[in-house]
């Protein structure tokens, strides 16, 4: 049998990946599955299927695609073959997500339709990148927060994103994830490359300054598509978060996306990342 996948949102990239996510309705645990037998044989990426997608879905799925591109770029499994794909996806998302979000199908414009088409392509490109390079703790955190509090995946991704970038983009004595091709810790350098590629920082700017510029531009992007990037602003009860903190931290640590993250997190660091999102 052949599997033919036709995406109807511009986010997950599932049409070209070996991944699936399941949620246990009883325990509220969300967990990814990975097996190359899950990869479709054919992907039909037709933007006609997303021209009437609601704005909210456009914003959340678009930020999910951005995270796929960012995490695959800084992953310990990234390579010369995946990084260009990640970069093109990042470029398309920065340039088109806001226009795609504000597009009104009731009053169609060529610019809006093109933006939705570009976002659809970007999501699949990001899927191609992370199908080979995998993801990181932005997704680990979002899986567990989303499952526990019932937040849409892309929203949980957006909330965790700036904290994960700051956590990864450090220098000095860093506990890096061991991987044969990842011999020196370079996450800050990788994020800085993205920032310079997008024109957010110049070649004379330090890597630290370039990363700060990238985080600032991502904040502008989430603001432009009306995403509140705090747990408190999305109805999460702090007492509930604190009560489940130990359990959530363990689940994040064990998530299938954690091993490819460039910085290997300790349980106490994961707890702080969870609290910082509030």
Feature map (PLM): residue ranges:
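Gly/Pro-rich interdomain helix-loop hinge
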Residues: 155-243
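Flexible, glycine/charged-enriched surface loops at secondary-structure junctions
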Residues: 77-85, 102-118, 133-138, 176, ...
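Short, amphipathic C-terminal "tail helix"
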Residues: 238-278
């Amino acid at each position: 049998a052949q599997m033919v996948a036709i995406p109807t949102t511009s986010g997950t990239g599932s049409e070209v990946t070996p991944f699936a996510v399941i949620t246990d309705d009883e325990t509220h645990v969300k967990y990814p599955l990975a097996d190359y037998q899950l990869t479709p044989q054919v992907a039909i990426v037709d933007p006609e299927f997303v021209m009437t997608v609601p704005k909210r879905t456009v914003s959340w799925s678009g930020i999910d695609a951005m995270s796929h591109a960012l995490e695959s770029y800084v992953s310990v499994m990234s390579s010369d073959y995946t990084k260009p794909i990640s970069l093109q996806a990042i470029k398309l998302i920065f340039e088109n997500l806001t226009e795609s979000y504000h597009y009104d199908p009731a009053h169609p414009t060529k610019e809006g339709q093109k933006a939705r088409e570009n976002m659809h392509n970007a999501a699949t490109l990001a899927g191609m990148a992370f199908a080979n390079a995998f993801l990181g703790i932005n997704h680990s955190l979002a899986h567990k927060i989303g499952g526990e509090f019932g937040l849409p995946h892309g929203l949980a991704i957006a909330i965790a994103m700036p904290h994960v970038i700051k956590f990864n983009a450090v220098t000095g004595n860093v506990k890096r994830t061991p991987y044969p091709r990842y011999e020196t810790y370079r996450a800050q350098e990788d994020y800085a490359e993205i920032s310079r590629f997008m024109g957010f920082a110049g070649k004379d700017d330090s890597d630290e300054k370039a990363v700060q510029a990238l985080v600032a531009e991502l904040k502008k992007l989430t603001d432009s598509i009306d995403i509140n990037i705090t747990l408190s602003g999305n109805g999460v009860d702090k007492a509930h978060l604190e009560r489940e903190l130990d359990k959530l931290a363990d689940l994040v640590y064990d998530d299938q996306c954690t091993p490819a993250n460039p910085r290997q997190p300790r349980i106490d660091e994961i707890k702080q990342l969870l609290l910082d999102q509030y």
